Amino acid sequence: MATKSGPPIGPFPPDVETDEQKEEYDKLRRRVLWKMPYGLYVVGARDGERRNGMTLNWATQVSFEPKLIGISVEKDAFTHELITAGGVFSLNLLPQEERAAVRKFVKPVVVDPDGKTLNGYAYHDGRTGAPILDVAAAWVECEVRNPVDCGGHTFFIGEVVDAGFQADEETAVLRMEDTRMSYGG
């Protein structure tokens, strides 16, 4: 998960005027944002027979009633295309010992529909058809209720239509800080 870089993007405080000051302020702002705690997930997506899994860290519960989950997906990602067209997604919470799995889903996914694997990881279709990794400690499955344009990403708000555990409820799940990965800022 690489962080996009480029020219600093505002807004900037009034005392930040020169290009050099903007660059330094942008670096500071990124370091602060990288301190925000994040989970690390594999989001599953489906449209018809097309399926995908993608490493994702921008996810949160946004409502109790109804139960809503929000995920932010980069617009040029294949997963974005599938969620937009299919209207569903799964959020797979991996156990901490599955660090290698999230690295596998940073790269393009090889789908074996006959063997029911994504990048070699077994999956089953959830109630909506979104893939749920068999290795996931827990998962939620959502139907998109409200996509929100957020610049380079879309924040998909989905209603939880199914959820479950595939490991003991006390299993520690993977977080960004458990790896050397970073995405944000």
Regions found by a protein language model. Give the residues of each.
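Basic, polyanion-binding surface patches
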Residues: A2-G185
